[in-house]
């Protein structure tokens, strides 16, 4: 509910983030649920965006997540010094981080209608 996301907003510090599952955009009922959820979050948080991951064990394999914050933009505020930390991961890198927020056109269209 909008009240729930309002409570999340109140609970977060200025540097806090909220992440939630936004379902699969592939199936009409899930896409509608994603739109309704994103609309509620956007009405509460000044920064609200969507990112994606491909998870083969999930229905359709294409899954969306919501990102919301009072002050932090997940791409613009990405600290590039991550690359200088010398952390070796099998999956994560800053290019992938930015790429997760690049959405296919059909998802952009769903979000434009919110």
Feature annotation, model-predicted:
Residues 59-61:
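Short acidic/glycine-enriched loop/turn segments that link adjacent beta-strands
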Residues 5-6, 31-54, 66-68:
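Conserved Class I S-adenosyl-L-methionine
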Residues 23-28, 56-57:
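Short "lid" loop at the C-terminus of a central beta-strand within the Rossmann-like core
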């Amino acid at each position: 509910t909008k009240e729930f996301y309002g409570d999340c907003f109140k609970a977060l510090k200025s540097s806090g983030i909220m992440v939630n599952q936004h379902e699969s955009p592939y199936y009409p009922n899930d896409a509608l649920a994603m739109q309704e959820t994103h609309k509620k979050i956007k009405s509460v948080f000044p920064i609200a965006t969507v990112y994606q991951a491909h998870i083969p064990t999930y229905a359709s394999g294409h899954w969306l997540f919501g990102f919301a914050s009072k002050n932090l933009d997940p791409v613009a505020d990405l600290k590039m010094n991550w690359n200088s930390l010398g952390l070796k991961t099998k999956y994560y890198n800053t290019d992938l981080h930015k790429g997760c927020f690049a959405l296919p056109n059909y998802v952009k269209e769903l979000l434009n209608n919110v």
